[in-house]
Amino acid sequence: MEHNDVKVGLSVSMSGKYRLQGQQALNGVSLWQSHTTTQGGIPVGSVTRPVRLVWYDDASRSGRARENVRRLLQEDRVDILLGPYSSNLTLAAAEIAEEQKKLLWNYGGTSDEIFSRGWKCVVGISTPASDYFRDLPGWLARQNPELRRICVLYSGKGTFGGQVSRGIIESAQEASYSVHSVPLNDPSSNPDLVLSTLRELNPEVLVLAGNFQDELAILQTRSRWPNTVRIIAAVSGGMAAFGSQLGQASEDVIGASQWEPGLSVSPTVGPSSEWFVDAFQKEFGPTPGYVSAGAYASVLIAAECVRHMGSTDNDALRSAASQLNCNTFYGRFQIDRPTGKQLGHRVCLVRWRDSAKTVLAA
């Protein structure tokens, strides 16, 4: 490859527990690459430079993600570094990015912990974890005001589940709900613990905040839950694979989604949602989910900052990102300047019925 290529690099989970989301992310970035290539590349100053994509499988492991990021920065010398999927892997990648003073464009790690360490290298694209279900108590108050008891089962591993739990606890307590938060580890290997917890608390609203596999394992025991449970919400309910993998057990489950094809957004940067969905389906087949959309949006935003500054210099791109306030098909982009935490983007609540997701009114 010629030295003037703009190299885009990422550590991505093509194996291990995040392989589904990793493939979705890679599809999103690959679509951006192919579309940008048809346009001749990225404008950098007075020259339009071709793009090159470099990625390595991290096998859903933090240690491998660190190795991959170090390789991307020291050997491949990428110009744009994208983060992996999952908060744990993003924390690992960000450690190396901060050490190497390289900006990390983060679509897939949403734990608030990522933005609380004083790092200057992370630019968040997606809504932070603590806001995933922050609007759920308000929705419940309008739709089911008689329900007052909420139980949050969250993953005790890592920081993501605890941050989701914190957000809903704060908003539920403000609305005078009774709320219990219970950490769980490996529920698939101990389903009786989940059942005993539910039978002890008898919640009316159950919220799950874990990884995809753990939430599926819990929901597969749904027929044995106490009949007090009237409303179910799960972080993974925002993913397209949720319904196909759970079948009837997904019925009426509420999810949190970073993006849905039907959302009305007028982009000021990049293509429309309609274009993205159509192009993605032509390239890969299925309708894209929010992981693919977020990955595409992250490199779209990075490229916009390159175009605006006429440079791939790290400090210049951080300055551009701090000043940028725009809409892409993925939603609004505006970060907190000191931390890089995303402020403008919003999640939406969705509900599964008849194997399909619908967006709930805000």
How would you describe each model-predicted region?
Residues 121-183:
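An alpha-beta-alpha
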Residues 57, 114-138, 250-259:
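Short beta-strand elements at the ligand-binding edges of bilobed clamshell
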Residues 223-294, 357:
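Extracellular/periplasmic periplasmic-binding protein-like sensory domains
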